[in-house]
């Protein structure tokens, strides 16, 4: 059976991920008038730029929906966000500043929870606003079919008739007005924004040009810390984890992870923490550029990784980072619930996160400028007396012990010298001018 429908399935139940904006409003009304029975589903993801969630389903009913549901996805979204922090599932970074995969996390939750709600209502055809050039069309496709194997996909933006009749925002606005729904287009921004409780993504339009930087963005989760007239005072904050779970901020415990995340967003947002400018590779391998906000994710990630480095050994930390890079890419590709991702994620949560108990104190300043002021944990393996430059009682090892350890290194040093001689004879290395250190030759082959 074909899973992607190229034209509107008239007379059938069709679900649409409904945001209440012009695009989905026009699509809903158009599908209704063309003969589909339209069901509208709205995800409450805690979007910081959404004022009234309850109004969105009411709009959908006015535009002709058979049924409109608001699905609260916030708790599940925060659960997945914490899992990403625990497993370090972030593969895109620039200069050590990470993109926290907040949009991929939102799509994983939206794609599964909305399709599950549709299935309850007997709706097995799903449409959303993702375009064919982006990542979301594939993410939603995967998560939708994982949740409901009987699902078929209909996207108005892939239907040539819809494109011919309502090809742009001006046509959509005129269409709504002509049918009694005065819809005044909002002023066009220089970029588009997509957000959820974990973070915000700003991209497209002017931001497609690399000479347009972060300064054209109006933050929705933080402050424009780059502006001289933006007052940002230094602030000390403590973050506490218990067995990998963030449980307290500044001594205040939170039973509800959503409430904790909202407070983390507020604290980090006051400084513009977690904003970054990234060039990334989309699923189809074309590069795109985005400017991201994630104040709460950044705050929790910094504290979590500080405890990771103070508690775990080098090999565990190395594996955590390597696996996190791989897991981050799987998450980005819409494979967060695939077996290979679950394997990496569960391993990190079991063998890394469960040991992460403690408290980290930070001083936040402007943007990503911060200092770590204190680190406390009953599980720390950091012990300054082991390497103290002062004379200590019961030293863990002696000068004689180190002499023996260094002597054992003679074996691999000799092996390395032998290999260098082999490479020199093969013409891959030559003696450095005025130096006994070999240097690489240009590849002649």
From Swiss-Prot:
Enzyme Commission code(s) on record: 6.3.4.5
Domain of life of the organism encoding this protein: Bacteria
Binding positions for L-citrulline per the UniProt entry: 99, 135, 139, 192, 201, 203, 280
Disulphide-bonded residues: none
Catalyses which reaction(s): L-citrulline + L-aspartate + ATP = 2-(N(omega)-L-arginino)succinate + AMP + diphosphate + H(+)
Family assignment from sequence similarity: Belongs to the argininosuccinate synthase family. Type 2 subfamily.
HAMAP family: Arg_succ_synth_type2
Name the UniProt record assigns to this protein: Argininosuccinate synthase
Naturally occurring in which organism (per UniProt): Rhodopseudomonas palustris (strain BisB5)
Upper taxonomic lineage: Bacteria, Pseudomonadati, Pseudomonadota, Alphaproteobacteria, Hyphomicrobiales
Gene this protein is translated from: argG
């Amino acid at each position: 059976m074909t899973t992607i429908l190229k034209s509107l399935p008239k007379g059938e139940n069709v679900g649409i991920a409904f945001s209440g904006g012009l695009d989905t409003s026009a699509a809903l009304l158009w599908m209704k008038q063309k003969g589909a029975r339209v069901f509208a589903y709205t995800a409450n993801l805690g979007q910081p730029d959404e004022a009234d969630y309850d109004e969105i389903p009411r709009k959908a009913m006015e535009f002709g929906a058979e049924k409109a549901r608001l699905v609260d996805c916030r708790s599940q979204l925060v659960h997945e966000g914490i899992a990403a922090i625990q497993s370090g599932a972030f593969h895109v970074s620039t200069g050590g500043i990470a993109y926290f995969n907040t949009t991929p996390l939102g799509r994983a939750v939206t794609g599964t929870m909305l399709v599950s709600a549709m299935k309850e209502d007997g709706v097995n055809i799903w449409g959303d606003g993702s375009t064919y050039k982006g990542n979301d069309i594939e993410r939603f496709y995967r998560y939708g079919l994982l949740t409901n194997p009987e699902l078929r996909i209909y996207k108005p933006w892939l239907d040539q008739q819809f494109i011919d009749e309502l090809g742009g925002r001006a046509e959509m606005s005129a269409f709504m007005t002509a049918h009694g729904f005065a819809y005044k287009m909002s002023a066009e921004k220089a970029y588009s924004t997509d957000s959820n409780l974990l973070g915000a993504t700003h991209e497209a339009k002017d931001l497609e040009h690399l000479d347009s930087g972060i300064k054209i963005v109006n933050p929705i989760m933080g402050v424009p810390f780059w502006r001289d007239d933006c007052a940002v005072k230094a602030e000390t904050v403590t973050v506490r984890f218990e067995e990998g779970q963030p449980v307290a901020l500044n001594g205040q415990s939170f039973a509800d992870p959503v409430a904790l995340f909202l407070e983390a967003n507020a604290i980090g947002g006051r400084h513009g923490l977690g904003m970054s400018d990234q060039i990334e590779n989309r699923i189809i391998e074309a590069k795109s550029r985005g400017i991201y906000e994630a104040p709460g994710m950044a705050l929790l990630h910094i504290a979590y990784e500080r405890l990771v480095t103070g508690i775990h050994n080098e090999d565990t930390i190395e594996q955590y980072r390597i696996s996190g890079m791989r897991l981050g890419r799987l998450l980005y590709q819409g494979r967060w619930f695939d077996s290979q991702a679950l394997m990496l994620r569960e391993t990190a949560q079991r063998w890394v996160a469960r040991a992460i108990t403690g408290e980290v104190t930070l001083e936040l300043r402007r943007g990503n400028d911060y200092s770590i002021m204190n680190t406390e944990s009953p599980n720390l393996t950091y012990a300054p007396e082991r390497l103290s430059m002062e004379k200590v009682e019961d030293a863990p090892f002696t000068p004689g012990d180190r002499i023996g350890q260094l002597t054992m290194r003679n074996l691999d040093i000799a092996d390395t010298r032998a290999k260098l001689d082999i490479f020199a004879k093969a013409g891959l290395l030559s003696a450095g001018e005025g130096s006994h250190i070999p240097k690489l030759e240009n590849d002649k082959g």
